Amino acid sequence: MSATPRVLLLIDADNVSTDVIEQAVSRLHAEYGALHVRRAYGTAENAVKHQRLFKRLSIRPMVNLATGKNSTDIALAVDALDLVIAEHPDVVVIASSDSDFAPLVARIREKGCLVRGVGQKGKVGEETPLIYDEFVEFEHRAARGARTLKDAASDADAAQAPARKTP
């Protein structure tokens, strides 16, 4: 690893809560000093609804227009391999609470990178931390009203619906 490691942060924004994203960015910044690439993968609706968070944390939203099962995971995986080849990072951090990324993690490790995982405590399966070189689980601060990006999007849609008047 070089004196200042090159670090990529790739976020499955459909799978982790906004407060976990904030905690991860804060911790990684404290550990490495800089995160060279910060990207969040998710739906167009989530990108728009969370643009303030992404802007504040300097996270580039990567809009996934496909709607099929695991389409966000696939978009993240394809981009991750492109970035590993082009950017030659020392560390790749994947923020997701699911274990779908096992083949991706193995391939990135083969390219010589340390692969860290970040997830939400209570959502992470038993096997998920074993996939990564290192894995950190963050508490979901539900008391503050933090939710997953999908949940927050659903709430925003419901809030925009016309109110019903009761007699």
Task: Give a label for each model feature.
Residues 1-85, 109, 114:
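Domain-level signal for Mg2+-assisted phosphodiester chemistry and nucleotide/NA-binding surfaces
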Residues 14-18, 101, 143:
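Short acidic, S/G/P-rich loop/turn micro-motifs used as interaction or catalytic elements
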Residues 46-51, 120-128:
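Short, glycine/polar-rich helix-capping loops at beta-to-alpha or helix-loop-helix junctions
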Residues 61, 92, 135-136:
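Short, well-ordered beta-strand core segments
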Residues 63-65, 119, 138-140:
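Short beta->alpha connector loops at strand-helix junctions that form conserved
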Residues 84-126:
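A glycine-rich beta-strand to alpha-helix segment
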Residues 125-146:
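Structural recognition of alpha->loop->beta junctions
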Residues 147-167:
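N-terminal regulatory modules in eukaryotic regulatory proteins
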